[in-house]
Amino acid sequence: MTDRDYKIAVLPGDGIGPEVMAQAHKVLDAIEQKHGIRFSREEHDVGGIAIDNHGCPLPESTLRACEEADAVLFGSVGGPKWEHLPPNEQPERGALLPLRKHFQLFCNLRPAQIHQGLEAFSPLRADISARGFDIVVVRELTGGIYFGQPKGREGEGAHEKAFDTEVYHRFEIERIARIAFESARLRRKKVCSIDKANVLQSSILWREVVSEIAKEYPDVSLSHMYIDNATMQLIKDPAQFDVMLCSNIFGDILSDECAMITGSMGMLPSASMNESKFGLYEPAGGSAPDIAGKNIANPVAQILSAALMLRYSLGEEAAARDIENAVSQALAAGELTADLAGSKPALSTSAMGDKIASYILNS
């Protein structure tokens, strides 16, 4: 093997997963041809299809394949067929959560942008959406109020209470901050750290540690913003943001807000990574069982997930940009799938994959 041979565990999953993953394969084929990179790709069952074939949503063989890979390209899991199962045995909880835990995927990256030609889909005011935006939300995934102890309920009657605890350790903040600054170096070199340091002790520590880490990256500018102001600024002027660095709960909120203001949630990729840059890359949307098998699903989120994989886990920045530029070219040319075409002629899932692959080869 050369240093540009990569092993990818491909987990198409359920619903539209296999259809859109087939388009990601086409795009990776084009990247191999153009850049001289080689991807060794093996597909494995995960989610509902794994329950049907192996009796559990994350078979040992699938987990082993992920352990032996440089990265995981994930489709989507779930559907009505498996909703009768106990929650922890359903495709989503039984596959994705164990993968995140097993590989210690503490960082979630969610890009959000308005592509040229799709401004009208944004719910933002026309003059704001016309300016466009290109944001990455860097969210800490394994700490904070979702996992802090103690948590629970106690008492009864008027004195019954429930409680959760926001806990962050210095090392957790340091490692997520470094990923935000490294990401900014590949972009416009701006990090905005989101906190509530006027109220929360955890946010005071967050701000202190992020400011310390910023000194390691003198070429990247750092600003701080309170979460309540950030939610407003995203509506008022999203173009001001480049990389938004967030705790678990704040990132949960802001990544969904960023997705919604694009107006095209079906095109957004997502990455979850650990400290060694091993990552799981997937569309931010679901398995869409209602349109599965109809060759009408939008494959762009899956294709852009492959671009994130190239950038963050494999270090192939030029190849990642080629994919993103090809997607932008296709959309700007009005080559759209049914979810975006409206009354205009729509491309099928497979035709969209072909178009994007051809733009890569002809650029």
Curated annotation (Swiss-Prot):
Pathway(s) the chain acts in: Amino-acid biosynthesis; L-leucine biosynthesis; L-leucine from 3-methyl-2-oxobutanoate: step 3/4
Cofactor note as given: Binds 1 Mg(2+) or Mn(2+) ion per subunit.
SMART domains per UniProt: Iso_dh
Broad EC category: oxidoreductase
Domain of life of the source: Bacteria
Positions contributing to Mg(2+) binding: D228, D252, D256
Sites annotated Important for catalysis: Y146, K196
EC number: 1.1.1.85
Pfam family, one: Iso_dh
Sites where the protein binds substrate: R100, R110, R139, D228
InterPro entries for the chain: IsoCit/isopropylmalate_DH_CS, IsoPropMal-DH-like_dom, Isopropylmalate_DH
Cofactor dependency: Mg(2+); Mn(2+)
GO cellular component: cytosol
Role according to the record: Catalyzes the oxidation of 3-carboxy-2-hydroxy-4-methylpentanoate (3-isopropylmalate) to 3-carboxy-4-methyl-2-oxopentanoate. The product decarboxylates to 4-methyl-2 oxopentanoate.
NCBIfam families in the cross-refs: leuB
Known partners and oligomeric status: Homodimer.
Name of the protein in its database record: 3-isopropylmalate dehydrogenase
Organism: Vibrio cholerae serotype O1 (strain ATCC 39315 / El Tor Inaba N16961)
Organism placement in taxonomy: Bacteria, Pseudomonadati, Pseudomonadota, Gammaproteobacteria, Vibrionales
